[in-house]
């Protein structure tokens, strides 16, 4: 499964344990792109709403992401967690390390684009200042994380200790591994952004193998 060789230390390599973020080991070289917002807000969207088959979002999710059956997060072959981000963060398939002020690093991959009308500065959402929106299966996630208002984690993953904290740095991940400097050619090419701008998601057909 995806956790094998993905930078996570986890007793159960078949599923993603959020607590493993505390011991996450970065595998790829990265370059800081600065912080456009330090917001701690971390909202979510359900991936099953993307329906445009021709969009880069749909194609990337369909071909490179797997729904974790424990937490409902979507993860790619590198173990990066699927999120929606603004236009400042490039094309679909671009990977980042999100460093929090708690010392935790969250590896994310842009699988959907925040609509420009909803994030006019290209970074944070106008209505809640969130920089990242986790792309999840909300049914699985609700069963795992819970919530008191009908929303997963009451609508904000910052309510979860493992994800709590303000953004301290955002680093663009390269194809070059830290330990050996060899290009990891098996990683998927970044896809071109489509005209689809809705913050929405669609079912996954792909999967990982050991």
Please report, for each region that a protein language model flagged, where it lies by residue.
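Solvent-exposed, well-ordered loop and adjacent helix/strand elements within mature globular domains
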Residues: 16-210
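Sec-dependent N-terminal signal peptides of Gram-positive bacterial secreted proteins and lipoproteins
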Residues: 1-9
